[in-house]
Amino acid sequence: MARFFQPKKKLQPESKHQQVLVEKLDHQGAGIAYLNKKPLFIDGTLPGEEVVTQLTESKSKFARGKLIKLLKPAAERVEPFCSHFNQCGGCDMQHMDYQAQLAYKQRTLLQLMKKFSGSEILLSPPVTGLEKAYRRRARVSLMWDKKSRQLQFGFRRKQSKQIENVTQCPVLVAELECLLPELKAILSHFQHPEHLGHVELVAADNGAVITLRHTGPLLDEDVAKLRQCAEQHQATLYLMPASDQLERISGEAPYYQEIGFKVPFEPNNFIQVNQKVNQQMVVQALEWLDPQSSDRVLDLFCGLGNFSLPIASKAKSVTGVEGVDEMVQKAAINASLNQINNAQFFHANLEQDFVGQPWASEKFDKILLDPARAGASGIIEQVSALGAKRVVYVSCNPATLARDSQSLLEQGYRLTKLGMLDMFPYTSHLESMALFEK
């Protein structure tokens, strides 16, 4: 007998709306309630709040919901200061009092360290800076909408490729925020807006930097308008026709000062977003590492020399190692510029065994490492082979710090200090620093 196709019935959600009590926050800042004993994650909610939520996703072990109505607010809830909150993907915790955010981030750090490494320790005071107007770097997304014939200018929405149009951003430093409306007006009238990729904004110590990434040729008259805007704001203008090409059109080469050291950089180089927290972070790293005039120090993932240069002023020698060759060359130039002659820099793949590398043939007294979010799993097991009695680990991901800490503890190190660095206020993102000693 012939069988006819029958479409599967759509799974019906348990209910369009559910009233729940939020019990805690997850490590990404989402509220956690429980529905039939299953964790339900709801963005924009706080512990102790009674809310009405609409299920947007339901799996066997968890569900996600959208906040529909706030029935009982938490004492820590505050009014967001940005009109784009809940749309822009940048800040996700503007609804929470700042001091409560700090407490939440410190709890998160402690919980992760205990879960993965079994370590329990009293936290050092958090390193903080300005709550607002702290970002000295931002990437503005651009997209030409063929239907509306309008240029979309702003930041990506949360977990989306869509752009939230903005002409103000309260977490940007003032010299960058004031550029937004003017840049949008100028770029909207370019003859070939479909060639525009994004704008990178950086606040260097010698002025703002505007970098326009474009994917096709631009008219000279359009570039002239952009140059005029940059000159009026005493900013440096770069064009980036390809991801590995930079052309300085006007202005000075940018640099920033770091506790007495001048660090030149290009707009596509990595620098820390929060200048005040970065300065305090470097000072704390020096205090914890405590380099002496007889110490040989290894700086892994050294970048432009953010830590290497200050360490070199106190140690016998510094060896900086970085996975990006261009950064290695710039770090060496920066050392020379600052008249540092006891630092050397090497390019190496820090995701694999490095013990056989020439620079690793001698022992080191102390080590500092500052890896990317993925952590240092490729090399962490080799740290003890280098002979260091003291290791400072600067982390931008507490989960990978906790994972790598387990390896250091197994190598005989003790976790003696741990602290949170609030590099990104009003977001769930947290950075941290840990000191390990033998």
UniProtKB/Swiss-Prot annotation:
GO biological process: rRNA base methylation
SUPFAM superfamilies assigned to the protein according to its UniProt record, in alphabetical order: Nucleic acid-binding proteins, S-adenosyl-L-methionine-dependent methyltransferases
Annotated InterPro entries: 23S_rRNA_MeTrfase_RlmD, MeTrfase_TrmA_AS, MeTrfase_TrmA_CS, NA-bd_OB-fold, SAM-dependent_MTases_sf, TRAM_dom, U5_MeTrfase_fam
Binding sites annotated in the UniProt record for [4Fe-4S] cluster: C82, C88, C91, C169
Cross-referenced Gene3D superfamilies: 2.40.50.1070, Nucleic acid-binding proteins, Vaccinia Virus protein VP39
Binding site for S-adenosyl-L-methionine: Q272, F301, N306, E322, N349, D370
Keyword Ribonucleoprotein: no
PROSITE patterns: SAM_MT_RNA_M5U, TRAM, TRMA_1, TRMA_2
One GO MF term attached to the UniProt entry: 4 iron, 4 sulfur cluster binding
Domain TRAM, residue spans: 11-69
Keyword annotations of the record: 4Fe-4S, Iron, Iron-sulfur, Metal-binding, Methyltransferase, rRNA processing, S-adenosyl-L-methionine, Transferase
Catalytic site positions: C396 (nucleophile)
NCBIfam families: PRK13168.1, rumA
Membership in a protein family: Belongs to the class I-like SAM-binding methyltransferase superfamily. RNA M5U methyltransferase family. RlmD subfamily.
Protein name: 23S rRNA (uracil(1939)-C(5))-methyltransferase RlmD
Organism this protein belongs to: Vibrio vulnificus (strain CMCP6)
Source lineage: Bacteria, Pseudomonadati, Pseudomonadota, Gammaproteobacteria, Vibrionales
Gene (UniProt): rlmD
